[in-house]
């Protein structure tokens, strides 16, 4: 039976590739169904012989307990946004300072969910969400139900690829029709539907909803020398790659492509929200490098957001954790990008003055970055009142005088004991990107603060189970879970704590970078500003902010109290040792290694202080080669770059 099962799996996978990837089926649906039923019957009779790449794995049937966290071997960076021709010109100017004659590749920006797929020996072993770029959720079983994702590759490769998982418009309409018939709330848009589907614990639901993918990048070090060649290679491996793309020599060509795509946008079978522009040559990408958050060699042009008119009803002023006082407009409800919007940010007092926003104005509201509702401008022809908005002079939380510094656009409360700032700081500390204390959300934090059970973040770790029972609506089971979540967070790697402290200019990426170098928050607190500023991608502003924070007596006391309660202050990830053998060197791995997996070689190089990249450039210091190194070895020799082999790496 094994031979026939092999034949059926090979045939059905080939037909599926023709249908989903090539859009060129060679057999009728009825023939595919007949062969599929035959395979199901054989697998039912001989379950021990079911093959790893059998298409029956896609049908569903598993109910998952939840999704485990998964650390990305290769981080997923965000992209810098551009909203105008002028911003694209500025991007081009920055690139040309480093690259004399760049060629760009323009690809559609799919409005879906970023995914990472990892294959070992050609078999899909992990499908993961983007998460925060460093840690995502393992949704492998759900992604196996997406019919155009290959379960196996034609080669026994170890490879990680990136792409977007989305819901086609036709599938979206079908899903919403079923939900309507079942009396369930409809999804607002295809992106929300795709996100909700991938979060399903029942894989059978995923299988029914006909999600699709476009792959756009090999995340693991590529043997191709350009993005365009990389896309063609992904196609050869059986992935679906969006065919709508161009190579461009200048911004005029890019802008023409953007205008063309904008006109076709509504007729596409899937949603897009822009065009991604990348430097095509991978060596040039390497020269340009990254900021802390984004590659310097790419930009995402975003199409203008949908706009609607609404009437301004009133303005709320709220205090954030840094003391900035933000105005929020209350509006007559409008439908915007698939959701009902009744509140929108007014940004700050300078924005209100610049836009001359007055009481009862009719305003244009849109979603900034397709996410945050914001007031864009006033419809002056519909103005009904000349009365200006009331700008507060005192903090709405603590009644302290508000300040408006010359170099800032916002009002600010500088009272360190302001209740709103303290509470927002506690909420931030417990949030997912910081200490990730499950269940300790804004509602519970507000109740703890109101009951005077917590005044600073160290107090969180002094709480006992019985303290939670004092809060309205909290039962014994919830109290136990909250206490357990707090105890578990003590073991977090220290970059989570550093971000949670809410130091100005120190975000999650910066926190990780700092701890990679200084290994612990205690070491960082003793570092001088010159040492911090010398770290690549950081600078004087961050260094000064850290120096100011750690110079205060309060920070010293807080860190001591956190340590006394058992909170970990050490970094648990891969550190960078300043005096390591390869510290500060840029290294390229190429060719087939015989004894080490590529991931093992990369980890070892990084542990020795090296930055491992995929392309050879003038910034490359060393190339480690295996068998069949090919053009990269030749290029290294031409550039006079030092070359070492696998045995040398093992000896370190």
Curated annotation (Swiss-Prot):
Q: List the SMART domains.
A: BRCT, HhH1, LIGANc
Which PROSITE patterns does the record match to this protein?
BRCT, DNA_LIGASE_N1, DNA_LIGASE_N2
Q: According to its UniProt record, which residues of this chain constitute the active site? A: 109 (n6-amp-lysine intermediate)
Q: Give the similarity note.
A: Belongs to the NAD-dependent DNA ligase family. LigA subfamily.
BRCT domain: from which residue to which, for each copy?
A: 577-652
What residues does Zn(2+) bind to? 395, 398, 413, 418
Write the Enzyme Commission number(s) for this entry. 6.5.1.2
- Swiss-Prot/TrEMBL keywords: DNA damage, DNA repair, DNA replication, Ligase, Magnesium, Manganese, Metal-binding, NAD, Zinc
In the record, what terms sit under GO molecular function?
DNA binding; DNA ligase (NAD+) activity; metal ion binding
GO BP annotations of the record are: DNA repair; DNA replication
> Under what name is this protein listed?
DNA ligase
CC terms in the record's Gene Ontology section: cytosol
Lineage: superkingdom: Bacteria
Q: Which reaction does it catalyse?
A: NAD(+) + (deoxyribonucleotide)n-3'-hydroxyl + 5'-phospho-(deoxyribonucleotide)m = (deoxyribonucleotide)n+m + AMP + beta-nicotinamide D-nucleotide
State its role. DNA ligase that catalyzes the formation of phosphodiester linkages between 5'-phosphoryl and 3'-hydroxyl groups in double-stranded DNA using NAD as a coenzyme and as the energy source for the reaction. It is essential for DNA replication and repair of damaged DNA.
Coiled-coil region list: none
Instruction: Please name the InterPro entries in this protein's record.
Output: BRCT_dom, BRCT_dom_sf, DisA/LigA_HHH, DNA_ligase, DNA_ligase_AS, DNA_ligase_CS, DNAligase_adenylation, DNAligase_N
Q: Which cofactor does it need?
A: Mg(2+); Mn(2+)
Name the enzyme's class. ligase
Gene3D superfamilies named in the record: 5' to 3' exonuclease, C-terminal subdomain, 6.20.10.30, BRCT domain, DNA ligase/mRNA capping enzyme, Helix hairpin bin, Nucleic acid-binding proteins
